[in-house]
A protein has these predicted regions:
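Soluble C-terminal extramembrane regulatory/interaction domains of multi-pass membrane proteins
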Residues: 9, 16-24, 36-129, 134, ...
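Membrane-interface "helix-start" segments
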Residues: 109-113, 141-148
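Cytosolic ligand/metal-binding cores
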Residues: 137
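Single conserved hydrophobic/aromatic residue that forms the stacking wall/gate
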Residues: 1-7, 11-12
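Short, surface-exposed helix-loop/turn micro-motifs enriched in polar/charged residues
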Residues: 2, 32-36
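Terminal helices and disordered tails flanking the catalytic cores of nucleotide-processing hydrolases
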Residues: 117, 144-145, 151, 155, ...
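Charged, heptad-repeat coiled-coil alpha-helices that serve as long linker/dimerization "arms"
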Residues: 24, 29-31
Length: 224
């Protein structure tokens, strides 16, 4: 999908959010069954986060379009790191959408550990890219684009976390997203830590090897 197509869909999303938000607010003032009230609450608490996911997609498409138009590219190391991070982004969005559609609490509970890892990866990648800039491996223009991507990726993960928390809190009469998230991050039970460790192993950004080093390892005979 091109940048212009992504941008054109932004107007559609904005209209949908306005219309859905108005409808849900009006609906919430009626006499609803407990299940209907829960569903209405879930939609009201997540609609803005879904809309913001679209906004960040627009931002990312603009960065990609600018890189293409100006024939700029990242270093091989930066490409590798972004590829790993983008795989994590695909998984967290899939987990979020699936848990929302299926109201799957177990899947929703795996979103926050991945969000935390994505935040850590974004910080690590920023520091690595600063080092490459200092070493002359990347130029300043691509450095700005790299940071823009990381900012949007981190925000996408945060909105996914908000949606997952809303799903987990669906059965709670006292909805407090921020307090719940703070509590989860503080306690970090065995299930949380297990999920985090799995993601940490799966999305390891330390696997990159320069082309020259890879070729050398292939050519050199193994020691017996």
């Amino acid at each position: 999908m091109t940048s212009s197509l992504v941008g054109s869909e932004m107007c559609i999303r904005d209209r949908y959010e306005d219309k859905l938000g108005t409808y849900l607010m009006q609906l919430s003032m009626h006499d609803l069954t407990p299940d209907q009230a829960k569903q209405t609450s879930k939609f009201l608490h997540t609609i803005s986060d879904f809309e913001r996911l679209g906004d960040h997609a627009v931002n990312i498409s603009k960065v990609a379009q600018e890189l293409h138009e100006k024939s700029r590219t990242f270093s091989e190391a930066a490409k590798y790191e972004l590829d790993v991070l983008e795989q994590a982004l695909v998984e967290i969005t899939d987990l979020t959408v699936n848990s929302f559609v299926d109201e799957d609490l177990n899947t929703a509970a795996t979103v926050e550990p991945l969000r935390e890892l994505i935040g850590i990866l974004c910080n690590d990648l920023k520091m690595r890219h600063i080092k490459r800039l200092r070493n002359g491996q990347c130029d300043l223009n691509t450095g700005f684009a790299f940071n823009d991507l990381l900012t949007n990726y981190e925000r996408i993960a945060a909105h996914c976390s908000n949606i997952a928390v809303a799903i987990l809190e669906l059965d709670s009469s006292n909805f407090d997203m921020h307090e719940y998230t703070k509590s989860v991050r503080k306690l970090k039970d065995d299930r949380y830590l297990s999920a985090f460790e799995k993601y940490e192993e799966k999305y390891d950004i330390n696997g990159y090897r320069p082309k020259e080093e890879t070729e050398k390892r292939i050519i050199e005979p193994k020691e017996k």
